[in-house]
């Protein structure tokens, strides 16, 4: 699930470029990706789980998860694109798997396994190899990109320790998306950056984006955290920049360096190591 989620996330730039061409800005897109997915999530939740009810005691935790993961993280990351290249932002953002693993060990006394450490090292070195020193490097972009990694790590750790995991995943995702969408819509309105799509085709692209990311990638990632834990899921999510790289080469005609190819191989290796650890654990 985490791997499939990372692949879908890796396709986001391709979809976003076409949406931006229609006049929609990044802040509005984050809001729309949450809001447009709500009817689908609600219908599936009602059909599958017969209800959208949740314990009132779960609402504060859901709200914190929503603000961190569905509002703060994407808003910070997307704002960094105004000052530095998206590939640089992605590399800086991916400090979050390190923060999740280290945070789990220091704050929650999780045990560090040899497989986990090896996977984390491969992931870290692999993502760093995506960095190109010739690209723009502005502190105004570095700070929000780094903060997006911090908020994402907090989101993953909170999600992996969420007490009410018995809440059906579609119901959970509905409330997380509703709160996240409301917060980002408010930010867009207050900052006067609300630029809605104009044509039917533009709305269609935004809907496709919302269904792919919110109903697809986000839901799969949330479920994977519940199943395998935040540390492993965050390392596996490093396949996202690798997917973006191959999309850029095969579809957008972008160039590729030896470092990026080696980085991709290391990221894939980190995923295989984590997967192998899971197989060994089941056999034992």
What name fits each language-model region?
Residues 11, 15, 22, 37-57, ...:
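Membrane-interface helix-cap regions at the ends of transmembrane helices
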Residues 6, 32, 74, 88-95, ...:
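Helix-helix packing/entry segments at the starts of transmembrane helices
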Residues 19, 29, 33, 80, ...:
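Hydrophobic/aromatic residues within transmembrane alpha-helices
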């Amino acid at each position: 699930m985490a791997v499939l989620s990372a692949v879908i996330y890796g396709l986001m730039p391709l979809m976003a470029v076409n949406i931006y061409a229609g006049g929609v800005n990044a802040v509005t897109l984050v809001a729309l990706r949450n809001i447009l997915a709500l009817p689908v999530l609600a219908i599936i939740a009602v059909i599958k789980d017969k209800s959208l009810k949740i314990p009132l005691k779960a609402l504060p935790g859901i709200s914190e998860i929503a603000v961190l993961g569905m509002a703060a993280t994407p808003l910070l990351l997307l704002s960094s694109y105004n000052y530095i290249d998206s590939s640089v932002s992605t590399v800086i953002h991916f400090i979050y798997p390190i923060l999740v693993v280290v945070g789990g060990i220091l704050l929650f006394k999780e045990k560090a396994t040899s497989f986990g450490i090896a996977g984390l090292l491969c992931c870290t070195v692999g993502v760093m190899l995506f960095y190109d020193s010739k690209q723009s490097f502005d502190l105004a972009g570095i700070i929000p990109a780094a903060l997006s990694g911090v908020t994402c790590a907090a989101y993953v750790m909170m999600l992996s320790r969420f007490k009410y995991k018995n809440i059906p995943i579609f119901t959970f995702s509905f409330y997380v998306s509703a709160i996240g969408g409301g917060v980002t819509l408010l930010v867009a309105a207050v900052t006067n950056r609300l630029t809605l799509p104009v044509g039917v085709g533009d709305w269609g692209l935004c809907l496709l984006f919302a269904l792919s990311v919110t109903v697809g990638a986000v839901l799969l990632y949330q479920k994977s955290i519940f199943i395998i834990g935040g540390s492993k899921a965050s390392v596996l999510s490093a396949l996202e920049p690798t997917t973006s790289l191959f999309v850029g080469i095969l579809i957008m005609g972008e160039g590729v360096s030896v470092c990026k190819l080696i980085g991709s191989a290391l990221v894939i290796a980190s995923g295989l190591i984590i997967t192998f650890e899971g197989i060994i654990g089941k056999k034992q």
